[in-house]
Design a protein with these regions (language model features):
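Feature responds to low-complexity, polar/acidic, surface-exposed segments characteristic
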Residues: 1-10, 15-39, 52-64, 76-84
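Glycine-centered, phosphate/nucleic-acid-interacting loop/turn motifs that mediate DNA/RNA or nucleotide
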Residues: 49
């Protein structure tokens, strides 16, 4: 199914890319430190420029994303050969 929030979108693209290690795993104020999987996905997505509305220390994992936003991020990841 199509993700409906930032957490789902980040996880989908990151997993499709093979779960690459981000250069730095950030501590976002709104992602539990125990949720390493999501912190890695969010950090990698931000590093790749795929989530450009991330605040300095806030990911907003439950922010609603539209189907169009998901498609645009998907296309950008494909264009940059991050996913196949």
């Amino acid at each position: 199914p199509m993700p409906s929030n930032s957490a789902g979108l980040a996880t989908l693209i990151w997993e499709k890319a093979g779960c690459p290690e981000p250069q730095t795993v950030k501590s976002f104020s709104d992602i539990d430190d125990a949720d390493l999987h999501l912190r890695q996905a969010a950090s990698w997505m931000e590093e790749q420029g795929l989530m450009d509305d991330v605040k300095e220390n806030e990911f907003r994992p439950y922010r609603y994303v539209t189907k169009l936003q998901t498609c645009l991020v998907w296309d950008k990841a494909k264009e940059e050969s991050l996913i196949s």
